[in-house]
Amino acid sequence: MTGLKPVAEIMFSDFFAVCWDIVANEIAKTRYMTDGQVELPLVIRSGNGGGSRFGAQHSQSVENWAMAIPGLKVVAPASPADVKGLLAASIRDPDPVLFFEQKSLYGTKGEVPEGEHVVELGKADVLRSGTDVTICALALMVPRAMKAAETLEAEHGISATVIDVRSLVPLDTQTILSETEKTGRLVTVEENPRLCGWGAEIASIVAEELFWSLDGPIVRVTTPHVPLSASDNLEDMQIPNADRIVDAVKGLAD
């Protein structure tokens, strides 16, 4: 409101629950309620998701909470290059952006372009092109989807397209629809519980737009509808992995 572009941090995205009134009722709605006279170009970075053994209150994936609030933009990078590019785009955006960083990806290494690097919000990234099935993934699920795609090709002769959704609001429906139409099959992979996850939204869009082009049902790979455990064995069973993705695709292909 004073011309600055603050970048705030919430260490664990679970704690959005503590400040949700401010985020959902004030920050998200100010531009609309002032007829565009007041902009809030705020970026809130937050550690999101499981896999780090932090337990039920520090491991939730809450990006689907934010998707339902008009006025908020929502992104979740999976690579070091996209962290730089999406963060730059988020800071330049006139609207508030929730920037979710999957905690288990903090140690990821990869090439990062030098100098200015901006990745447009609302643009998905097709990481791998295939002919038999399209897999949509986000954040930690992206490398797992890529691993699954390699296994599917090498061991089962199934060619998979992998899309890094990376921007949930705005959502790149054009790329998702185009790539799904090419293969006729869609699998979404996410850390959210099955009920009301972002995969359900993508599934509904694809069903509405491409129903007669699909060669099978849309399959969602998710966590179960239970709190994530701090136990290694239990958390590993809950969060989707490459093997579960392979099984889901094989079932669809059969």
Language model features: what each stretch is:
Residues 1-144, 160:
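Conserved thiamine diphosphate
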Residues 37-43, 51-53, 103-254:
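Thiamine diphosphate
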